Amino acid sequence: MNSLQVLTKKVLIENKAFSNYHEDDSFILQQLGLWWENGPIGFCKQCKMVTGGSMLCSDVDSYELDRALVKAVKENQTDLIKLFVLWGAEINFGIVCAKTKKMKDLCIQLGADPKFLDEGLYNMFVYLVKQKKVLLAIDIYYDNILILDSFDSHDFHMLIDFMYNRFILNLDEKEEMTRNTLVLKFWYKFAIDFNLIKPIRYLSKKFPHLDDWRLKTAIYLGNVDEIHHAYFQENIRLDPNHMMSFACIHPWNKLGIYYCFALGADIDNALDILLRFDETNKEINRETGRGISLYIEWGYLSNVYFCIGLGANPYIKKIQDTIKQKNSNIMILLFSRKKRILSPHSVLQNKILDPTDVRKMILTHENTENFYPFSELAVRLIQQANI
């Protein structure tokens, strides 16, 4: 049962009793547990957001209710924990962050499942992925040694790798990372992939040392909104040809490839990168079924065709030398075009940088007549090569 003190706080906060507080009152409000971040605590019933001072629900620093609970548990703010649960926060998110027996007992008293730490972690991870709760997930996992150590090392990496269709670590070339860094980059990449603006802005503010990595990830995943924002609004700059190398290693990445091209990357060099990408077939054939292999390889062929549509010339000596050195389905495709039917596509010749216009242009390109015959040809060639 909640104390009269907690219920009183609930009524006062919901009625915005501290919206016009005086600076001299700040110390008293902090001592009474009515302070959040940089001002008196506020709560929006409609949005389920916890705010501080003049903060709005939409602000980057505002907290979803479950995140506020996790923060309160980490800071041992007992009354706030009770208050947030009263508003509807999921107390099981709190127990996984409790560092002391006293705090765990409080969470159990408030309704947490005592077995959650043993039986609920996998389901929690899946829930956070499905609901795209990026910031909540980072609040729970980041620097939470108890939770990170509860995962078997192999299973932990396999779980994250599987949840991201096996491309989660490609950008970092499967370098050795601490579990903390792996968790952070997984969820950061997740936010960029789904273009979750608030999590991206919050994480970019909190982890500025990852700015270059963020731009590379946006390129790799073809998030032109984030590329545009990072490049032009935050002035995060990399050499366009270096950026193109990241765009090329992800299948079906027309948006990423085009944007690097529009920024000045050499498109012939991009085609050469694709043809020299030895890891393509290794990744395709490692632990994948034939159906998945076909889909991924078709995605790389799509990148090759798209580069040619942008003006890359597959018949110049540099590319022909690469073709002679390699033996893959991509080469079979190019060898089959000796009549030089492949040529630049008129729709793609204007270099534009507005993300909305870029998406419209790519959609127009995909809806043109000469795209689909090529796709059918690519499938037949791959199927013949895999027999």
Curated annotation (Swiss-Prot):
This is Protein MGF 360-4L. InterPro entries: ASFV_MGF360 (IPR002595). Plays a role in virus cell tropism, and may be required for efficient virus replication in macrophages. Signal peptide: none annotated. One of its GO terms (biological process) is taxis. Belongs to the asfivirus MGF 360 family. It holds the Pfam family ASFV_360.
